[in-house]
Amino acid sequence: LGWEILPEEHAARVGGGDFGRTHPDGIWGDYIREVNPAGETVWEWHMHENIEIEKYPNAPMSGTGEWGHPNSVMLNHDGDVMVSWRHNNLIAVIDKKTGQFNFEWCGFELGFQHDFQVLENGNYMVFVNQDPGPGAGSKVLEFDPATKETVWDYRGKPRYTFHSPFISGAQRLWSGNTLICEGMWGRIFEVTPDKELVWEYVSPYFT
């Protein structure tokens, strides 16, 4: 996963964003490159060449100097590429054969998300940094990719007790429990499927 300066004709089509942060050379976009053990490129995908730029503007409260801001990439069970783009509130799966999305979810309800991944049961999971609703809070969301219906989620009770507006992630453990990183506060904790806290660590260092 890498960043690149967009060609001017593509950069001119990028919309949205609120902040005035810019790069002197233009607007950053991104690409994905797969290499073999010898370091040779075997597959490459550039966002601005494969999707409709106007359909995915930067969300409000995101910068204008970068389009997308991808923050996670992995393969699903079919070998296709799962990507999270924070600035667009977009998660999608790229068909490696066509270069097009075969799954996408774009909306404010994803809340500048991180750590989009597939679970062993075939469901998808994502860390929603800014979970919409009254008060500040985050959410770990497991959902059925065929319907986008919630299978399981975790929120703080009350909401503000679990909130990281940036970084962060979650991992489903072999036991069925979920390990969660609340990145802003250096907190790692484990919860059961019934959302019971069974382990917790808070780093004494803050950077």
Regions found by a protein language model. Name each.
Residues 1-207:
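Histidine-/acidic-rich catalytic cores in large beta-rich domains
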